[in-house]
Amino acid sequence: MVNVGINGFGRIGRLVLRNALQMQILTVVAVNDPFLDVEYMAYLFKYDSVHGRYQGKVETKDGKLIIDGHKIAAFAEREPANIKWADCGAEYIVESTGVFKTEELAKEHLKGGAKKVVITAPGSGVPTYVVGVNLDKYDPKEVVISNASCTTNCLAVLAKVINDKFGIVEGLMTTVHATTATQKTVDAPAKKDWRSGRSVTNNIIPASTGAAKAVTKAIPDLEGKLTGLAFRVPTLDVSVVDLVVRLEKETSYDDVKKAMRDAADGKHPGIEKGIVDYTEEDVVSTDFVGSNYSMIFDAKAGIALNSRFMKLVAWYDNEWGYARRVCDEVVYVAKKN
């Protein structure tokens, strides 16, 4: 078992813990969040408006979070350097605060006894790895790495299959993205991006995203070929990527569908089974709540204008599915070390 500490017990932090308990490969031994006492941690973990009530036993005792009898140390430190990871044996840290995203800041965890740090966001100046795309290039000498974003995890896998099979000349990506915690429930000031301050409950909000450009960190061959934007919408979970691509090779949409089916079956080089799913059913977003896949290709939603210009559609659970990939990445890093 791999001993893990979680810094930041927000949406991703809590779902990483749920996934770890389900997978039974990782052992979460400690959680740190300066804004939550242990009783509140237990409450937020037990009750979830999207993914439902945790079905096991959740309790607290002597300042520890106890889940199904498993004791988890609870810290409330503001600075990573002050978290005593070594006291509970946490070697691999999931950095899910959204704050400590540079190598310098994330390395502060090592002062408390950690060995490796995986950031659950695009990192600044940090090696980026996407499961099923470039994780095999991970260097065990690297102490801090990024698992990129939820959107990048979906888009990178989709782009890898298309680029490997048909070649991408250029592409534009739109993600129709579910609500996240940083958005406002009613109109409020947002100095950096005025539109992001508008109410999420009754608006479709155009937003910037670095997801498309971040794909090039995992697939350097696509440098300068992809960009994109986001629309934030009033749904709680599950997002969808709309990728319009110009292809190098002439092909048919049926050939694209076959390539995606093969990827879903684990037949595409580098993409293990369980990363990609494929559907031809009449699905909508809530059908993918709790999906483990990085990318679910929606064959019915896509369309081809001609043999080299196509619109491709792929779903992803931006919470649960992403948290599963974080766990997968930690497992891989631990095996390599």
From Swiss-Prot:
Swiss-Prot/TrEMBL GO biological process terms: glucose metabolic process; glycolytic process
Reaction equation(s) it catalyzes: D-glyceraldehyde 3-phosphate + phosphate + NAD(+) = (2R)-3-phospho-glyceroyl phosphate + NADH + H(+)
GO molecular function terms noted in the UniProt entry: glyceraldehyde-3-phosphate dehydrogenase (NAD+) (phosphorylating) activity; NAD binding; NADP binding
UniProt cross-references to SMART domains, sorted A to Z: Gp_dh_N
InterPro entries per UniProt: GlycerAld/Erythrose_P_DH, GlycerAld_3-P_DH_AS, GlycerAld_3-P_DH_cat, GlycerAld_3-P_DH_NAD(P)-bd, Glyceraldehyde-3-P_DH_1, NAD(P)-bd_dom_sf
Superkingdom of origin organism: Eukaryota
Predominant subcellular localization, coarse grouping: cytoplasm
Residues at the active site: 150
EC number: 1.2.1.12
Intracellular or extracellular location(s): Cytoplasm
Residues holding D-glyceraldehyde 3-phosphate: 149-151, 180, 209-210, 232
Gene3D superfamilies to which the protein is assigned, alphabetical: Dihydrodipicolinate Reductase, domain 2 (3.30.360.10), NAD(P)-binding Rossmann-like Domain (3.40.50.720)
Top EC class, one word: oxidoreductase
Subunit: Homotetramer.
Protein name: Glyceraldehyde-3-phosphate dehydrogenase 1
Originating organism: Agaricus bisporus (White button mushroom)
